[in-house]
């Protein structure tokens, strides 16, 4: 998930004499004293760290058994086929991750020196909030580093990544040994504990003084002060429920067989995931159409002010004119490039509607009619031969159009008909809005979208 947090850029021009006109200052670099005197400068450091959070798209599936692509030079395809190198590593996060962690370490060390507000109560609340944000972001960046760069050494040890929690100056020794995988997990969990202790689960305005959460009552008993710092204007910043979600991911990573996970680790991961699900009222608290959050037009069009449907914990800002996903992944007959092609392996993983896997004799699976009676998510997430999609003809009128992917289909949607055709007989449908028209001669405009 890269979040579109607005980058703070502040410029101050001071003309104090003729000499200043001919002696330019260092290009917009602020010294520590200037940062300490302005909460805007200090928050700018933190907001820039949000901007480094990796974007979440589905291209990584090309390196798995779930999808291939018709882009022959795709870096994830190179990973899958063994044609990648250290210099051409699409999952490399080393430099970005450590640069950002070092900024966060400096930010944490300097928090108490910054004037966060003129009045004491909001200043203390701001200090508490940004401290929680910084610890949470550091945990997130260490998670990405661990996920992308941990592994088993030649002598069989499971190693993580180097750990440092203090600011390192440019002349420091950066040649640090790797910590063990378990040490890294403990550090991430510790940072998440710190974040949850300081942050509200969600940033929402409260209606009365009595609604202030207990952990903030030692700072303020006034709702207007609480709302100023912890209210709705802080939506989309790191919060307590995001910390719980990252904890779930970290513990799931630790439970994975790829990292020598054991049965106890699976139990820990399940408990962490349950805490996130319980936050929205359990499985029954989710909307019935939540599986298609990406094309539920009513909900998407209603998004505003950082509000999310229950299926979404964290997302980018909405994009009001973006059809890049549709252009890249629609079938050729819909003027798309058909880039992501689900594999038969993924299609076979969808069970029958009765819950049985298709390999089970009780499933009722019919190889002569392979898509009938399947889990309804199959038709929502994947275009298969004969499946229908609701396409717009460019005038605002929608039609159900069958996608024919067989090699003898007689359309450009068939297997390997052209460069933009599927390689597997399937096209990705998940993440795509069905009311976008990619016909270059169409007058239909791109529509609202967002990434989670």
Please annotate each region the language model reported.
Residues 1-28:
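Bacterial Sec-dependent N-terminal signal peptides
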Residues 146-148, 153, 203, 253-262:
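Short coil/turn linking the two alpha-helices of tandem helical-hairpin repeats
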Residues 249, 255, 277-370, 376:
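Polar, glycine-rich mid-to-C-terminal structural blocks
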Residues 40, 44, 74-151, 169-204, ...:
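Conserved, well-structured interaction surfaces
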């Amino acid at each position: 998930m890269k979040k579109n947090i607005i980058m703070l850029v502040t410029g101050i021009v001071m003309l104090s004499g003729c000499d200043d006109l001919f002696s330019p200052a260092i290009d917009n670099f602020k010294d520590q004293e200037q940062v300490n005197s302005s909460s805007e400068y200090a928050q700018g450091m933190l907001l820039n760290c949000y901007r480094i959070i990796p974007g979440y798209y589905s291209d990584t599936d090309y390196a798995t058994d779930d999808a291939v692509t018709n882009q022959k030079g795709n870096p994830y395809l190179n990973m899958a086929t063994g044609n990648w190198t250290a210099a051409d590593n699409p999952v490399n996060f080393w430099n970005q991750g450590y640069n950002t962690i070092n900024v966060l370490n400096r930010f944490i060390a300097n928090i108490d020196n910054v004037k966060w507000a003129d009045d004491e109560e909001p200043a203390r609340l701001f200090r508490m909030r940004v401290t929680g944000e910084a610890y949470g972001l550091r945990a997130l960046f260490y998670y990405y580093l661990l996920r992308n760069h941990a592994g088993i050494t030649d002598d069989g040890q499971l190693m993580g990544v180097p750990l440092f929690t203090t600011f390192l100056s440019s002349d420091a020794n950066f040649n640090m040994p790797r910590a063990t995988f378990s040490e890294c997990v403990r550090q991430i969990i510790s940072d998440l504990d710190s974040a949850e202790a300081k942050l509200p689960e969600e940033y929402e305005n409260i209606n009365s003084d009595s609604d202030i959460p207990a952990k903030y009552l030692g700072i303020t008993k006034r709702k207007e002060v609480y709302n100023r710092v912890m209210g709705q204007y802080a939506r989309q910043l790191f919060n307590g429920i995001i910390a719980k979600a990252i904890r779930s991911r970290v513990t799931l990573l630790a439970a994975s067989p790829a990292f020598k996970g054991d049965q106890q680790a699976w139990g820990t991961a399940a408990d962490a995931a349950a805490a996130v699900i319980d936050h929205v009222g359990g499985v029954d608290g989710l909307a019935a159409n939540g599986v298609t959050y990406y094309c539920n037009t009513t909900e998407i069009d209603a998004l505003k002010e950082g509000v999310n449907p229950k299926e979404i914990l964290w997302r980018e800002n909405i994009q009001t004119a973006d059809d890049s996903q549709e252009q890249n992944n629609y079938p050729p007959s819909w003027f798309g490039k058909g880039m992501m092609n689900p594999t038969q392996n993924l299609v076979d993983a969808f069970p029958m509607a009765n819950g049985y896997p298709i390999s089970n004799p009780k499933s009722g699976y019919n190889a002569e009619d392979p898509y009938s009676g399947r889990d309804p998510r199959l038709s929502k997430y994947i275009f298969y031969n004969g499946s229908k999609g609701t396409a717009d003809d460019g005038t605002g009128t929608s039609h159900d159009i069958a996608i024919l992917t067989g090699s003898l289909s007689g359309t450009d949607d068939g297997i390997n008909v052209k460069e933009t055709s599927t390689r597997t007989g399937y096209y990705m449908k998940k993440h795509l809005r069905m009311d976008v028209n990619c016909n270059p001669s169409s007058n239909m405009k791109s529509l609202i979208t967002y990434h989670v």
